[in-house]
Amino acid sequence: MGAGGRMTVPNKWEGEGDEKSQKPVQRVPSAKPPFTLSEIKKAIPPHCFKRSLLKSFSYVLYDLTLVAIFYYVATTYIDALPGPLRYAAWPVYWALQGCVLTGVWVIAHECGHHAFSDYQWVDDCVGLVLHSALLVPYFSWKYSHRRHHSNTGSLERDEVFVPKPKSKMPWFSKYLNNPPGRVMTLIVTLTLGWPLYLALNVSGWPYDRFACHFDPYGPIYTDRERLQIYISDVGIMAATYTLYKIAAARGLAWLVCVYGVPLLIVNAFLVTITYLQHTHPALPHYDSSEWDWLRGALATADRDYGILNKVFHNITDTHVAHHLFSTMPHYHAMEATKAIKPILGDYYQFDGTPVYKAMWREARECLYVEPDDGANSKGVFWYKKNL
């Protein structure tokens, strides 16, 4: 059938060259949906849109308490362990602390959406402190991320993870389109992807001049936003200076073990979560002839991270609802998701594939986008893999 309907196309989901592993991809419909945003909103209980300052702070307190407990246990007991146990204990600490700090990151992200409380100044103060502590320029990313939400799924205006057409793929892509190349690409993306995006706009929208999240006069920002970009930079400088003083007092190796490696895990999770939310063989992208806000917002996928769904405050498995109503607090998002599923029908995309398998599959299957053949397919682009 045409690109407007829910379409089944052949795709290898597991393994390469294994015919038994072939399963069909059920594409999300790309035609204009038979429902409106207001109809979706009416299906959600009204209390889901209410923000509680006390409840939001309770999540901050809970996460920071866990951070403090893990820090205390690590710095008090790990070095006292025998050698082999010590080397085994540090990775456990890194994993636990990295996961909890990712939850802290998500709360700061929620502040940027004004989903933390009814008071914008409270949201901005909390978000600035939490994100700065994780070396994220709060206001800078808040504004670029807002543009992503305003233009999701648009090949011409989306802010990040914008897929390229085949004609614009770099020359070296074909040399990386193999298992060793994918492993190398994933390692670089997970370790360096987030800081490179902030500093050099890597994987971001290609502006006509150099773009950087730390530059108040860069093309990402308007004149009205520049003062707050300075504030973000001050927050980063304050956090960096604090880390410098800690390293001077305790040693760089101590700082890397206690803070640096968990932060690396936070950054890796951030890239993984964002990539898998917007990259899937079933999801369409649109050019200006077809794009509209609702279809773009629906071109996202919910994923299953197991117990980490709760640790990450359900940003992983309620992302569709988040894109539709970004000021909704996370503690109501599960209820809202259940309420909107019957309305969305085939327009709702959930994939329960284990995360490590999904990352590998998407790295293999989702290399570039092109429209399908046929007049009815113009303006709607789908992921392809044959370079």
Curated annotation (Swiss-Prot):
A motif (Histidine box-3) lies at residues 319-323. Pathway: Lipid metabolism; polyunsaturated fatty acid biosynthesis. Signal peptide: none annotated. It is an enzyme of class 1 (oxidoreductase). GO terms for biological process: unsaturated fatty acid biosynthetic process. Residues 13-22 have a biased composition (Basic and acidic residues). One of its GO terms (molecular function) is oxidoreductase activity, acting on paired donors, with oxidation of a pair of donors resulting in the reduction of molecular oxygen to two molecules of water. Its EC number is 1.14.19.-. Keywords: Fatty acid biosynthesis, Fatty acid metabolism, Lipid biosynthesis, Lipid metabolism, Membrane, Oxidoreductase, Transmembrane, Transmembrane helix. Its main location: membrane. The chain crosses the membrane at residues 58-78, 88-108, 121-141, 183-203, 229-249, 251-271. It is a multi-pass membrane protein. Delta(12)-fatty acid desaturase producing in a heterologous system linoleic acid (18:2(9Z,12Z)) and to a lower extent hexadecadienoic acid (16:2(9Z,12Z)). The histidine box domains may contain the active site and/or be involved in metal ion binding. This is Delta(12)-acyl-lipid-desaturase. The lineage of its organism: Eukaryota, Viridiplantae, Streptophyta, Embryophyta, Tracheophyta. The gene is FAD12.
